[in-house]
Amino acid sequence: MQTDSTQAAHELGDASFYLHDYHFRQDNHNGICTLQPQSRQGYGNVYQVQPADGLFLSTGNWIPYASMERKYEINQKLVKIYYLESGSVTLIQNGRKAQTITEGIHLYLNKPSQGRVLYQPNIPISYASVLLFEDYIEKNLQDRFTPDDFDYAEVYDWKAFDYNTPEVGTLFLQIRDKLIAGETSRLYYESKVGELLSIVAGNFHKQRQQIASKQQNLSKSEEKVLESVRQAIEQNVLNPPEVSQLCKIAAMGQTKLRESFKSIY
């Protein structure tokens, strides 16, 4: 069973769940896989493209009519970066405490592992996703670029403020719109994946340098309130709270908040 689910995920990407677990209707046209729930299950569409072996980009906008559960057990390493625009989604992984997936950009690392994803009924699920299996990463990224450009090992150290940014959110919206429009260019999608990883890796290196050099200038209490500000921003990076609200969270004036926040983030 484990081998079957792993193979299905590698061959079909996220579509394996929709096809095998819930038997969504499928239509393949010019390299774009379109999936639709059965009429009794929900309403909407999921689009997926596979530019290369081990690489999948997808977007979905659909409404489940009843609670849905996705069980997975994947015996391969993979990296998934996705932007959840809306939806009530819960992740339960390897017996850990249930985690509610908030709106924004998220990183999922399979090392390998198993778990469940729960979807609540009658709440629109809107997302865009990039899924990379380890064989794609090694062949197309790790073997072609130096660690200064992309270091696979560093992915496991990425933090939310490296990838949950407006720039990354905008990139996912571009991918979403191209998929819906029927774009099939392998060059386009692989270049977008490269751009995505380059942005996040660049943010990671920048943040690491800044934290090392400037964190010593802030007190522990200031670091704590700035972390609260960062979390408030990450709740919706494309429409963050007003500066006045952030000042209240930090109990700082605008100038001090701006300078202190920039010093570590």
List each language-model region with its residue ranges.
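A short mid-domain helix/strand-loop element embedded in enzyme catalytic domains
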Residues: 140, 145-147, 153, 161-172
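N-terminal regulatory/effector-sensing and dimerization cores
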Residues: 33-150
